[in-house]
Swiss-Prot record:
Main location per the UniProt record: membrane
Signal peptide: none
Molecular function terms from GO: voltage-gated chloride channel activity
Name of one Pfam family that matches: Voltage_CLC
UniProt-recorded name of the protein: Voltage-gated ClC-type chloride channel ClcB
Function in brief: Probably acts as an electrical shunt for an outwardly-directed proton pump that is linked to amino acid decarboxylation, as part of the extreme acid resistance (XAR) response.
Record's subcellular location: Cell inner membrane
Keywords: Cell inner membrane, Cell membrane, Chloride, Chloride channel, Ion channel, Ion transport, Membrane, Transmembrane, Transmembrane helix, Transport, Voltage-gated channel
Residues annotated as transmembrane: 5-25, 54-74, 146-166, 168-188, 222-242, 258-278, 288-308, 316-336, 349-371, 380-400
Species, as recorded: Salmonella dublin (strain CT_02021853)
Length: 417
């Protein structure tokens, strides 16, 4: 057991380093190509001329598509191992290292160029890949899946500062591939990854800053649970829209470079209306939580952002859908909060409260992982007083969503990409 805990610690450190390497590569490329050192792609877009804002996502998509297409052409005759940690966990615990690195590099290109896709997909993949490489060299074959799971959980913890949610991400989303008794090393890896990330960043701050002073009573619990019901309906709708977008791109019969370029061009066109469509939505989520916008502004940004997410995901841009889902959930929750605010006092507080509820419940509705989703929002914001209400609402959202659509967003995304 001590040996496993030691390996879990080492994997946590490796995963944190992999996440940090991807983050620093993003910052470097943003500085080189966009003259941006703020870490915010929205700020980068605001500083560009309209024509550069239009073509940058398209060029990034084209470059990523050429990279993926070229790799596929070079390796057509070679047997393929998985390039996705979920697939690796469900097979024999091995990765195609070269293809995984190329996929991560392609993800880096589309993320840095402004596509509305999450960066956490590549971060978790690199963390799991680092864990797999270590495990194949130093551990017996029957443990490989455990260490890939530990690496994935540690990658989630490093990316989102949420070690408990990262561990439960493995337990809930990949249920059946691991015994509950194996979660000890997974938790250790996740916590060590978070501590290493804090050490590398020189800070232990929360991922999102929230100023919420509302007291929770029966009325607030009713609003939170009602948000869960709405999210339970919106989750399957979002996944259906993603599938429809993906199928629409496939019907165009474009080669991968042009398909990703088209997705990027759509994002570029939308960014002429509002630069907030660039990136995964992190900075927009933070600004909404600090200063909830009015009803009409939420609607305008939401409409443009959801179209950008559908264009990026549908075109096959390699990346995650986690943070974009958080933004969509936040917008839905704030919509509901503004509606409640027509009749109740403290409309900004209600908007923030239901925005957080929307983030958690839409995440639960799309991942079918209610406990992970609840803990994720609490760990990212520090608002642990919301845990009981969010847990009930997330279970409601997850059950309703699973009833309407069997597959989770991660299963769907893996099948399409």
């Amino acid at each position: 057991m001590f040996r496993r805990l030691l390996i879990a610690t080492l994997i946590g450190i490796l995963a944190a380093l992999a996440v940090a390497a991807f983050r620093h590569a993003m910052q470097l490329l943003e500085w080189i190509f966009l003259s941006n050192d703020t870490g915010s792609l929205v700020n980068a877009a605001e500083g560009l001329s309209p024509w550069r804002r239009l073509i940058t996502p398209a060029l990034g998509g084209l470059a990523a598509g050429l990279l993926l297409w070229g790799w596929q052409k070079m390796n057509q005759q070679r047997p393929h191992a998985p390039t996705d940690y979920m697939e690796a966990l469900q097979t024999d615990g091995q990765f195609d290292v070269g293809a995984s690195l190329v996929k991560s590099l392609a993800s880096l290109l589309v993320v840095v160029s402004g596509s509305a896709i999450g960066r956490e997909g590549a971060m978790i993949l690199l963390a799991a890949l680092a864990a797999s490489s270590f495990a194949r060299r130093f551990t017996p074959r029957e443990e490989w899946k455990l260490w890939i799971a530990s690496g994935a959980a540690a990658g989630m913890a490093g990316a989102y500062h949420a070690p408990l949610a990262g561990s439960l991400f493995i337990a809930e989303i990949l249920f059946g591939t691991l015994m509950l008794a194996s979660l000890g090393p997974v938790v250790v890896s996740a916590v060590v990854a978070l501590l290493t990330t804090h050490l590398l960043n020189g800070s232990d701050s929360l991922l999102y800053t929230v100023h919420l002073t509302v007291d929770l009573h029966a009325r607030e619990y009713v609003m939170i649970v009602s948000t869960g019901l709405v999210a339970g309906l919106c989750g399957p709708l979002l996944m259906w829209l993603m599938t429809a977008s993906h199928n629409s791109f496939l019907r165009l019969k474009l080669s991968p470079p042009w398909q990703l370029a088209l997705g990027g061009l759509i994002v570029g066109l939308l960014s002429l209306l509002t630069p907030t469509v660039w990136g995964n939505g992190y900075s927009v989520v933070q600004s909404f939580l600090l200063s909830p916008p009015l009803f009409s502004l939420i609607g305008g940004i939401f409409a443009c952002k959801i179209l950008a997410v559908l264009a990026s995901s549908g075109s096959g841009a390699p990346g995650g859908v986690f943070t974009p889902t958080l933004f969509v959930g936040l917008s839905i929750g704030m919509f509901l909060g503004r509606i409640w605010g027509f009749w109740l006092p403290g409309s900004d507080e209600i908007a923030i409260l239901l925005g957080l509820a929307g983030m958690a419940t839409l995440l639960a509705a799309t991942t079918h992982a209610p406990i992970m989703s609840t803990l994720m929002i609490c760990e990212m914001t520090g608002e642990y007083q919301l845990l009981p209400g969010l847990l009930i609402a997330c279970v409601v959202a997850s059950v309703l969503s699973r009833t309407l659509r069997h597959d989770s967003i991660y299963r769907q995304h893996a099948a399409e990409h």
